[in-house]
């Protein structure tokens, strides 16, 4: 079956199943191309919460499909590749988080959405890279537990005087971008602003001309007068950047910026998931209700 045939078959199945296809900005180009909506974790969470579709096909990783199930329990949520996990999300367990909470009684837990549903259920509020600063600034407490991304936590800490108890988690893909590589690129391309994701190492973030979520990158590059940009996030973002700003050049800061989990989902996987209506991701009510509380608190706060 050719890619074009696959795409038209997927479109037909989406219509037949009254399904919506959500794709994260880091997905393969051809998957983003057929998506009804592409976006970052926050945009896709909002979409999952408000869609009229009966079925949500989530092209992303496991925690994202869980978030869709938490926010839209009446929908069928399909994750074409059940093995598409997130190493960062796996770096925090419910048991370890409970231990930290016991050591710091009364200190609220702010959890990055890159976490399991069970961890969200132990949290006071969630955040994404697009709203993290506003989420933390909205809290009256003077100290917080921030999990699981130490890099995002370090970045947010710059904008507040709160005391942070940082979890020692990180994104292996973003962590691979080294400051010395960025310095060389900036020297070789002095006209190109370096735009990076706050999941990058703090030493890389210090070199950035602009730090933002993936959605923030699209907006920044569109509005900027610059014609060339050095991009410090996962390679999947390039497809939409080039589509939205075809007259501009985008230099990926490192060939190592590829997330193997985000690249697992193929058009064949999407087709099979729709055809067989499996694998389904469903969060149990006992976890869903407290996790939804943390997500709802986040969704009430405007994004950056």
From Swiss-Prot:
Biochemical pathway: Cofactor biosynthesis; NAD(+) biosynthesis; quinolinate from iminoaspartate: step 1/1
Binding site for iminosuccinate: 24, 41, 112-114, 129, 197-199, 214
Keyword list, A-Z: 4Fe-4S, Cytoplasm, Iron, Iron-sulfur, Metal-binding, Pyridine nucleotide biosynthesis, Transferase
Signal sequence interval, chain numbering: none
Cofactor note: Binds 1 [4Fe-4S] cluster per subunit.
Residues where [4Fe-4S] cluster binds: 86, 171, 259
Keyword Iron-sulfur belongs to the record: yes
Domain of life, per lineage: Bacteria
Main location: cytoplasm
Subcellular localization: Cytoplasm
UniProt keyword Cell membrane, yes or no: no
Cofactor(s) the protein requires to work: [4Fe-4S] cluster
An annotated GO BP: 'de novo' NAD biosynthetic process from L-aspartate
Known catalytic reactions: iminosuccinate + dihydroxyacetone phosphate = quinolinate + phosphate + 2 H2O + H(+)
Pfam entry (one): NadA
Coiled coil: none
Function: Catalyzes the condensation of iminoaspartate with dihydroxyacetone phosphate to form quinolinate.
Family stated for the protein in its record: Belongs to the quinolinate synthase family. Type 2 subfamily.
PANTHER family: QUINOLINATE SYNTHASE, CHLOROPLASTIC (PTHR30573:SF0), QUINOLINATE SYNTHETASE A (PTHR30573)
HAMAP family: NadA_type2 (MF_00568)
Protein name per its UniProtKB record: Quinolinate synthase
Lineage, opening ranks: Bacteria, Pseudomonadati, Thermodesulfobacteriota, Desulfuromonadia, Geobacterales
